[in-house]
Each structure stands twice: as structure tokens, then as C-alpha cells.
UniProtKB/Swiss-Prot annotation:
Gene3D superfamilies: Phospholipase A2 domain (1.20.90.10). GO terms for cellular component: acrosomal vesicle; extracellular space; lysosome. This is Group 10 secretory phospholipase A2. Its main location: secreted. Belongs to the phospholipase A2 family.
Length: 151
């Protein structure tokens, strides 16, 4: 059963074929974040649903590894976008996936541009990391209360 769970988490993203990853135009919701992660790869977006102290909903404490730092910086990026009047989890933006590369735009407003850049940075950041199973389903109680400050 654990092996099946790991294959689902670390295998190809659900609902995204190789052709979809190569060339497709998306509109955003939270599912679009998953699309950008799947476009760049190498793991399923599900692999980050509950990882470390920052990947998934919420976040606090000291990031545990490079993946967790990517998610922390993404949270900071979403906070900056929210401060600029955007709704990161609801606002939509146009983008394309071309040969595993994210192409943002054409943006109709600043929020679309900001949010696509946040998701793009996360996707490329995660692509260069090593995955540590010990941080999958990491108990949030083990994350400290104090968080690093966003830049």
C-alpha cells in the first residue's frame, strides 16, 4: 500500500499527459499551480501536498530542506501578491507549457503577471531539488513557531 502511495505521489502528474506538458494554454485556479509544477517536472504536484513545514496549506517554522525553502519562498511571493491586491488562490492568468518550460502571459494586469511569476519560480526551484521521503507528511507540531522573515 505504501508503495502505491509513493508511486502516486512521485509519478507523473494526474491528468497531465506528455503532450499536455509540452504545449498547452492554461487559466489559473489552484489547479493551475499544479499544472505549472507538472510542466517543469520531475515529480507529481501531489508529492508536495504535505511536505515539510511549508509545502501544502499554511506554513510556519524553519524550512527543512531545499524543497521546503522553495515552498517558503512561494508563500512569500503569494504574500507580496496579496499585499498588492491580488487573490493568489483565486486569480487566473494565461500561460503556456512549451517543452517543459513555462511561458507566462500575455498578462492582462499586474496580478496575472505576479502570480504567474510566483508559480514559475516555484516550479523551477522544485525541479532542481532532491526529494526526502522523511519530510512527506511531516508533522506540523515539529515545525517551530517562529518563521524566517520574507524578503
Amino acid at each position: 500500500m505504501l508503495l502505491l502511495l509513493l508511486l502516486l505521489l512521485l509519478g507523473p502528474g494526474p491528468g497531465f499527459s506528455e503532450a499536455t506538458r509540452r504545449s498547452h494554454v492554461y487559466k489559473r485556479g489552484l489547479l493551475e499551480l499544479a499544472g505549472t509544477l507538472d510542466c517543469v517536472g520531475p515529480r507529481s504536484p501531489m508529492a508536495y501536498m504535505n511536505y515539510g513545514c511549508y509545502c501544502g496549506l499554511g506554513g510556519h517554522g524553519e524550512p527543512r530542506d531545499a524543497i521546503d525553502w522553495c515552498c517558503y519562498h512561494h508563500d512569500c511571493c503569494y504574500s507580496r501578491a496579496q499585499d498588492a491586491g491580488c487573490s493568489p488562490k483565486l486569480d487566473r492568468y494565461p500561460w503556456k507549457c512549451m517543452d517543459h518550460h513555462i511561458l507566462c502571459g500575455p498578462a492582462e494586469n499586474k496580478c496575472q503577471e505576479l502570480l504567474c511569476r510566483c508559480d514559475e519560480e516555484l516550479a523551477y526551484c522544485l525541479a532542481g531539488t532532491e526529494y526526502h521521503l522523511k519530510y512527506l507528511f511531516f508533522p506540523s507540531i515539529l515545525c517551530e513557531k517562529d518563521s524566517p522573515k520574507c524578503n
